[in-house]
Amino acid sequence: MTWIRRCLTLTMALLAAGAWLPADARVQTSPDADAERAVRAIVAEQAEAWNAGDGRRYAAHVSPEVSFTNLFGMVMYGAPAFTERHVEILSTFYKGTTKRHVVRRVRFLTPDVAIVDIDNELRGVGAMPAGIPTPPDGIIRTQLMEVFTRRDGRWVIEAYHNVDVKAR
């Protein structure tokens, strides 16, 4: 019983200690600060490519085997499918939209594997494809999780999973 009480006390102390952290607190478990900068630079490059309407550039850092789930629940695999989809959407219903993002967390599972949580906002969204509601304010908010790995010194996106977030 004493052991259980100690475990519960320690758990509560750890939870209380973390409660004061802001929601956007960065988690840095990589011994290599350059790794985090490199991953963040790719996320920034994605936003630049999106805002330029360049689907190929947006997909430049995905791995050949990327796992991709979009905010409509479509699941695709592989760099060609990811690239084709982004070329298509940036030339049709997302043409002219502006992507803004906030990196909420970069967490390194190992020095060569990082999970990045990103709050996305697409502004200027107009008519959507049939069956998909058009946001009345022209803004789509999503939570994007990207999983990066370092291959031969180069960071690539292994998984890209995007979900719709309703306004709070």
Q: Residue spans of the language-model regions?
A:
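Bacterial N-terminal signal peptides
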Residues: 9-19
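Short, compositionally biased low-complexity segments
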Residues: 18-21, 57
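A beta-strand edge to alpha-helix "cap/lid" segment located at domain peripheries
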Residues: 26-44, 48-60, 67-168
